[in-house]
Amino acid sequence: MKTEDFDFEKKRKIFHISAIIFPMFYLFVPRIAIALLLFIITSITLYLDVIRHNNAKIRKFVTRFFSKIIRLKENNGTFALSGISFMMLGFFLTSILFPKNLVICSWLILIISDCLAALVGIKIGSSLSNGKSIAGSFTFFVSALFISILVYFYLGYNTSFVIIIISCIGATAVEFYSKYLRINDNLSIPLSYCLSTTIFPYIL
């Protein structure tokens, strides 16, 4: 593990964890309010993210403030999007498609579990061919399960412990195989968690 890799990921995750403001805010406002807010933020973020590749002024602005947390692949290509755009899109889609408390849980898992998995994986894990590690994925699953149980007891949503475990396994798998799925995990994690929690009760 290179020190510079861990330092870079730490800076990204500090910024990533600041998104905790969204689930906290959603606790106190109705769905329509958070959906409208996220629609505005997502639209602006996507616009700036796309146009920065072809607009020198926007690119200079983005580079000035976010160069230390943007990965190289997020700068390559005409329509390459940053993680924040995928996160906002994931937040917006789940907010309009799924029940409030389930959505809050999925956001917390993305924000907290993904951060812990990345930092633990880089610090002590052995990187596999997909850039992930067993230690990181195990950390993701355990923290996601812990968050799910807390939300289930304190906020409540219509599910069972079996479904919670399945959903956490699914979210962990999506995070682990994100490179092969070719879907940014900031989008796929909340969507997969909400989808599995919603669909599996009808299957099992």
Curated annotation (Swiss-Prot):
GO terms for molecular function: ATP-dependent diacylglycerol kinase activity. InterPro entries: Dgk1-like. This is Uncharacterized protein RP860.
